Amino acid sequence: MQRDGTNEQCFLELASPMSFILNILRNMLAYFGVPVDQDLLIFQNKDYGSARSIVRVIGRMLPLEPCRRPRFELTPPANAKEVDDYELAVPSFADVLCVADDGEAGCLRFRHSLWKKAEGKAALFHPSKLPWDLSSPALSQNRTVADDLPVSEAAIKKIAALEDELTSLRAQIAAIVAMQDLGGGGETGFISLSDGPSMEQVPPSSATARLSVEPDHVPSVVLSPPPLPPPPPPLPPPQFSLQPPSSLPVPPGSANTRGIDNLAAEMKKRPSGVKKTDGSHHSESQRVSDVPNMLDVLKDMNKVKLRPVERSPGGRPIQKRRRQSSQWDPVSLISNALKQKFAFQDDSFDSENRSWQGSPFSSPETSRNGSRF
């Protein structure tokens, strides 16, 4: 009986502090808003979730604001490229040499983050190292100074050469148009080497284009307005001759000698300035005579006919059979000779795997199924 009394006394002594601790825990949970009827399985803690410890449970019940998380943004440089130019790759030992050689960089960079050499070296962007603001008046003043730089002499020469070529092309186009108009009107004329500044002998009433010679001997084009009535149908162009017309037949040798003598006499009579202009007009007239007439080129366009091609019912063109080559054809002779030369050789696929005579040094033949023990 004494033993039973001592056991009950020990149990009460142990139970009183446990109940006291439980009361404290219940009061704390009630203070933080945890219902008393909720069973807290303290001894069955989970390895995941917010019920792993009492601290997490209390933190979930309390209306606490989460602390602010820092966010980092990478500002690209002024001449930044698109994101596609950068490659995502795992750094390797090859990046060590890249970092060691890059002495200008202020931070660590891998070789995959660098730009191409053709685009230029990659420049890091440091906002604290900007010498001035982008909207400052000093930057705008530098831009205006850079825009006001004088043009180089090479560019001026190129522009002048292009202008000269343009004027020459305009002169050629005007000459072609004038020749076509003369051929359409049915008026004949000829180009003479002994004329003055005019290049063609055309009455002023029927001329539709006028060529004027400038001091630098480049003809400029001044086109007159087109006539109101419709033009007549085109006629064959006149034949321009460098010789004066004559009714009597003249042998070619005598005509050439007479023309040369007349030109030499006229050149002696005229002053030196006129001789230069005549030479320029002679080159211009020769250039105009060398230009083909577009009417002659395009007059037979309506007569062009396509060759009929035989087609199958499906629409595919039928290929003609090749003619059998004769025995004396060089291609057939060479092919027959080659066939006769290599006819004794066996070109079968199994000839490489066969040996004519068994060699003592050759490897023994093995069966396909392998050796069986």
Swiss-Prot record:
GO biological process: aerobic respiration; mitochondrial fission; mitochondrion organization
Entry annotated with the keyword Methyltransferase: no
Record-linked InterPro entries: Mtfr1
A UniProt-annotated Pfam family: Mito_fiss_reg
Record field: compositional bias (Basic and acidic residues): 275-287, 297-310
Ranges annotated as biased composition (Polar residues): 354-373
Similarity comment: Belongs to the MTFR1 family.
The protein's name: Mitochondrial fission regulator 2
Native source organism of the sequence: Rattus norvegicus (Rat)
Gene that produces this protein: Mtfr2
